[in-house]
């Protein structure tokens, strides 16, 4: 969906990155052009699949890498989908903990970051409820 909206420039840049360095590993993130999208860039992060082990840690790592790439580029805001909760089948409870943990850990480690807004874009009602519950817990 993002690639279609962004256009061929994003796809071609992604192909160049993979040709130069190989596919991203779980926990890694890179930035490409946003193409036709009205953004400074698109961050590509690889989250874990259920069953590979340490899913929560690896998801926190992937999101942290994405936030770091945004910080390095001076982005002021970033929106991210429910990474690993769909076809990668990581349980929603694990995803909710990881999303909240990743944001808290990144903000603690980078209090001077240019990032002012971190948006989690959720379309799944149960996941929204779980993230709200996690946000209510003490860090």
Predicted region positions:
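Glycine-/small-residue-enriched capping loops at alpha/beta junctions
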Residues: 1-72
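Phosphate/ribose-phosphate-bearing ligand recognition and processing surfaces
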Residues: 49-139
């Amino acid at each position: 969906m993002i690639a279609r909206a962004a256009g061929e420039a994003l796809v071609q840049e992604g192909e160049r990155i993979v040709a130069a360095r190989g596919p991203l590993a779980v926990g890694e993130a890179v930035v490409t052009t946003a193409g036709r999208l009205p953004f400074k860039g698109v961050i590509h992060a690889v989250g874990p699949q259920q069953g590979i082990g340490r899913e929560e840690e690896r998801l926190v790592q992937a999101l942290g890498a994405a936030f770091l790439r945004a910080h390095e580029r001076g982005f002021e805001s970033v929106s991210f989908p429910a990474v690993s909760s769909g076809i990668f089948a990581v349980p929603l409870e694990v995803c909710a903990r990881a999303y909240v943990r990743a944001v808290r850990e990144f903000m603690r480690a980078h209090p001077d970051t240019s990032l002012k807004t971190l948006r989690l874009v959720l379309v799944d009602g149960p996941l929204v409820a779980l993230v709200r519950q996690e946000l209510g817990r003490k860090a």
